[in-house]
Amino acid sequence: SFGLHRRWLRKAIGEVEAGAPAAILDVATGTADVAIALARRLPSARITGIDLSEGMLAVGRRKVAKAGLEQRIALQQADCLHLPFADESFDCITVAYGVRNFEHLLDGYREMARVLRKGGRLVVIELSTPPSALVRPFYKFYTRCVIPVAGRIVSKDVRAYSYLPESIAAVAQGEAMTALMEEAGLSDTAFRRMTFGVCTIYTGYKR
């Protein structure tokens, strides 16, 4: 992404900051990069990060310890479709580049709406397909040709790099994504396209 992902993340965290949340759930936290960024930008917040992969969480715990944030970030293995939290447990929920991997996206949104407090905000950042017919051919060439070739050079897991463009193309985008959020019980949904639409930030509230 040529470093653009850092800019996108800053914008997404700006959406989180607007609500001054005290308790944040970071879904699909992976190696905790987003959880750590949230903790640094919101010094009074406590962050819970969940992920299915214990291996990634182990890496995340080492990163959290190195950052000296063990008292503010808790990482645990959990399924986003069956969140192990009581109703209305969090002021804000974030998902960075994870919803396209949900097995059942609507069910995932319903679970997140369940554990979100009234007045709380959901912030999702996800890769997307540019809507512009002028940009789309270059984007498709990059995702379908450049990324898989680069993947073969740097990794033996070629499938992981070919899966990326497939998963981006398959996930709901724009109005279709906000419609799912609303069906799950969220309101005042909105989306903002970043960098010609290769990334989109979605927001919604629980009323």
Segments the model singles out, each with a brief description of its role:
Residues 2-22, 37:
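Conserved alpha-helix/loop element of class I SAM-dependent methyltransferases that forms part
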